[in-house]
């Protein structure tokens, strides 16, 4: 990593790239000529290894037919568990605590159905007002399924500034009527990293189970679940982990809970040696595999095989080191080049509180995102006024960051954004 003090010059960006320990991984990814892709926090790029593993599993289907469940390089019957083992180091968990299955939202339904047991005065779920909408929809659904009113039984911690959450406020909300807590590890707009260790310890002091949505942290920051004693977690694999659109998601359950009957059981909840006995009494697996429901989506899982190989080689600590350095570099460039254009930095500046993306606020954010795309820079827009820019450690360069800020400066200086409507597209 380049340690010389920040300079806003193009030459400085090139020096940073020259000293980048991860630069060899850039050739692993398909990057479109003439485009700077800064949306890996929404959908990661395709790697050559992910492509290869997808084609390998297609070949297994072609070669083996039904026998692909137990034959070939990656037998499908054991694939979810195998990928759970490969994912476990990224969250600091044991292999048996981790499974690749379902989608983020179905996995939220699974963990809430399993851990939400309203009794006595403990009937409420604690979340926050800045979390991703799908999490809230799932929590509301699960509360209704218990015959309760979400307006009364779903507590959302308020934000003091509309961007971030105070951990003190979250802890203050851990009252005697809270039965369960689900929070984001990293806020999807501002990129704030919550202190999962502290929040877990405070929840457990009060006898409350706590879990986290890792969609914006897994593959970007290290986690230490074995040390932190988190109860459960869910995540998608198509952002920083580059598993592709609709890629199968992930689920973690602390080993101390792996004897719990899944709230949502299905055929693949079974112990492997019992599954084809076809009994009507479930013999659940004694590991995170019990929290699977139906048949694995094999072809939607396949790209993750190749992608996780890359993460094993790169190492999550090195990825975090570069991510912090390149996002800090981008923030410095923005401060130097864009101070005249009414942007507000919406993400935390402190390293320990900043995730993998930059969050800029501007009244013309939707228009600005369209102008960036027209000029070959791929950001994403988040209502009401946010521009997210994610320089991903595996495949983005400092040169790309420098160029993207210069392009943004030109868009603002020449008012290029005014040719676009200030409203989002169908998919922002």
Curated annotation (Swiss-Prot):
The modification N6-(pyridoxal phosphate)lysine is found at residue 239. Its cofactor is pyridoxal 5'-phosphate. Pyridoxal 5'-phosphate binds at residues 104-105, 132-135, 213, 216, 238, 267, 295. Transmembrane segments: none annotated. Keywords: Hydrolase, Pyridine nucleotide biosynthesis, Pyridoxal phosphate. One of its GO terms (molecular function) is kynureninase activity. GO terms for biological process: anthranilate metabolic process; L-kynurenine catabolic process; L-tryptophan catabolic process to kynurenine; NAD biosynthetic process; quinolinate biosynthetic process. Pathway: Amino-acid degradation; L-kynurenine degradation; L-alanine and anthranilate from L-kynurenine: step 1/1; Cofactor biosynthesis; NAD(+) biosynthesis; quinolinate from L-kynurenine: step 2/3. It holds the Pfam family KYNU_C. Homodimer. This is Kynureninase. It comes from Bacillus cereus (strain ATCC 10987 / NRS 248). The lineage of its organism: Bacteria, Bacillati, Bacillota, Bacilli, Bacillales. The gene is kynU.
């Amino acid at each position: 990593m380049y340690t010389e003090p920040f300079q806003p010059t193009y030459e400085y960006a090139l020096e940073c790239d020259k000293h980048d320990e991860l630069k060899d991984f850039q050739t692993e990814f398909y990057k479109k000529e003439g485009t700077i892709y800064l949306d890996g926090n929404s959908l990661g790029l395709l790697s050559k290894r992910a492509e290869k593993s997808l084609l390998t599993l297609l070949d297994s289907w072609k070669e083996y037919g039904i026998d692909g469940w137990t034959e070939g390089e990656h037998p499908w019957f054991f694939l979810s568990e195998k990928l759970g083992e490969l994912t476990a180091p990224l969250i600091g968990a044991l292999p048996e605590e981790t499974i690749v299955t379902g989608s983020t939202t179905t996995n939220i339904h699974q963990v809430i159905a399993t851990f939400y047991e309203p009794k006595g005065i403990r009937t409420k779920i604690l979340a926050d007002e800045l979390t991703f909408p799908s999490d809230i929809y799932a929590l509301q659904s699960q509360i209704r399924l218990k015959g309760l009113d979400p307006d009364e039984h779903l507590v959302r911690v308020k934000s003091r500034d509309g961007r971030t959450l105070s951990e003190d406020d979250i802890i203050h909300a851990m009252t005697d009527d809270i039965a369960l807590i689900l929070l984001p590890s990293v806020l999807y707009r501002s990129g704030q990293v919550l202190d999962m260790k502290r929040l877990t310890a405070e929840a457990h002091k009060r006898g409350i189970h706590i879990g986290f949505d890792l969609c914006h942290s897994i593959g970007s920051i290290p986690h230490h679940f074995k040390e932190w004693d988190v109860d459960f977690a869910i995540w998608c694999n198509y952002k920083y982990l580059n598993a592709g659109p609709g890629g199968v998601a992930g689920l973690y359950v602390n080993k101390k809970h792996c004897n719990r009957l899944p709230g949502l059981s299905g055929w693949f909840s079974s112990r492997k040696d019992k599954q084809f006995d076809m009994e009507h009494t479930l013999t659940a697996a004694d590991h995170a595999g019990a929290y699977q429901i139906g048949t694995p989506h094999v072809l939607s899982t396949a790209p993750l095989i190749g992608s996780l190989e890359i993460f094993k080689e790169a190492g999550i600590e090195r990825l975090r080191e570069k991510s912090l350095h390149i996002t800090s570099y981008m923030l410095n460039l923005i401060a130097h080049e864009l101070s005249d254009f009414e942007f507000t930095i919406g993400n935390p500046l402190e390293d320990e509180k900043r995730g993998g993306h930059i969050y800029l606020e501007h009244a013309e954010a939707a228009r600005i995102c369209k102008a960036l795309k027209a000029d070959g820079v791929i950001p994403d827009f988040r209502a009401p006024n946010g521009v997210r820019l994610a320089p991903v450690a595996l495949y983005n360069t400092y040169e790309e960051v420098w160029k993207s800020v210069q392009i943004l400066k030109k868009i603002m200086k020449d008012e290029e954004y005014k040719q676009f409507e200030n409203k989002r597209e169908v998919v922002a």
